[in-house]
Design a protein with these regions (language model features):
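Divalent cation-coordinating acidic motifs and surrounding scaffolds
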Residues: 2-291
Length: 291
């Protein structure tokens, strides 16, 4: 029996055919193990840093999803810290060291930051030396990941011999030794120096990290997003440089360029000299990693 196809039938068939969509970068699946980044953000919660941390708390709910969208194999850890004087006693840190270990659970990170407690800090110096030691030794770093720490600081670490009550007697932790330990583990320590501390520059130099001066408390969230976006770009650049598969290498380079594009769009209309300096510092490092 012959079937007659009418104009109406053809129209109906055309209407039921879905056009094929060209996959975008966001639709593509990241090749396994490429762009893998473990990054710990550590911020000083003492009184002088209150405005900086408040800015992060206000932005974190919107910022964290954007950061994780940039990299499907990202894990973040957060450390909020004070000083020895903020400990409950010699055996309990209390609010002096608050930590969420490396994780990809966005809700847990947001909740932790929003609920983190402020501290006093007491004297001028803070226990940055202990913070570095604990992050380096206790974080569950993945063996094949790019590793970074972002330390936001406005004071100096305690030197050898420092004593506070019986909480720490004759401090034996040297931040320089901790920096060498980080370098040996290929952990890059980026520092945001609120008061232009020279030790921050030295710490970053020792670990092949980036050190940027920063004064404006209302832009701390933007600075953190810039740093994490850039570190994701560098992780993809590292994956590309060590990859023999041409298609995977091309994908990683495409991700690098996409993340650089995000940074450019973030700062294309920015007239803030301080933020532009942060962006320029990180962009230069991305270019070096992508050579």
């Amino acid at each position: 029996m012959k079937t007659t196809v009418t104009t109406e039938t053809i129209t109906d068939v055309k209407m039921n055919i879905e056009p094929e969509e060209t996959p975008t970068l966001d639709d593509k699946v990241t090749p396994k193990g490429k762009g893998k980044l473990d990054m710990v953000i550590a911020f000083d919660t003492t009184g002088s840093m209150a405005a900086y941390i408040d800015d992060v708390r206000h932005q974190v709910a919107e910022m964290i999803p954007r950061i994780f969208k940039d990299n499907e194999d990202l894990r973040l850890g957060i450390v909020a810290f004070g000083d020895y004087c903020d400990m409950e006693n010699r055996d309990s840190f209390g609010n002096a060291y608050q930590c969420i270990p490396l994780t990809d659970n966005e809700n847990d990170i947001i909740k932790f930051v929003e609920e983190s407690k402020d501290t006093s800090g007491g004297d001028g110096d803070e226990f940055y030396e202990l913070v570095l030691k604990k992050i380096i030794e206790e974080s569950p770093w993945r063996e094949d990941s790019s590793k970074a720490i972002l330390l936001i600081a406005d004071a100096d670490p305690h030197e050898i011999g420092y004593t506070y009550r019986d909480y720490v007697v004759g401090n034996q932790i040297d931040w320089r030794i901790e920096a060498k330990k980080a370098a040996d583990m290929k952990i890059k320590v980026d520092t945001v120096s609120i008061c232009g501390r020279s030790w921050c520059k030295e710490l970053s130099a020792m670990t092949n990290g980036i050190s940027v001066p920063f004064k404006s408390s209302g832009k701390t969230g933007t600075m953190i997003e810039t740093a994490t976006t850039a570190r994701s770009a560098m992780a993809f650049a590292e994956s590309a440089s060590g990859c023999e598969d041409a298609s995977t290498r091309a994908y990683c380079r495409e991700r690098v360029h996409g993340l650089k594009g995000k940074l450019f769009s973030m700062f294309s209309d920015c007239n803030d000299e301080e933020l532009n300096d942060v962006c320029d510092s990180y962009t230069k490092e991305i270019d070096k990693a992508d050579e």
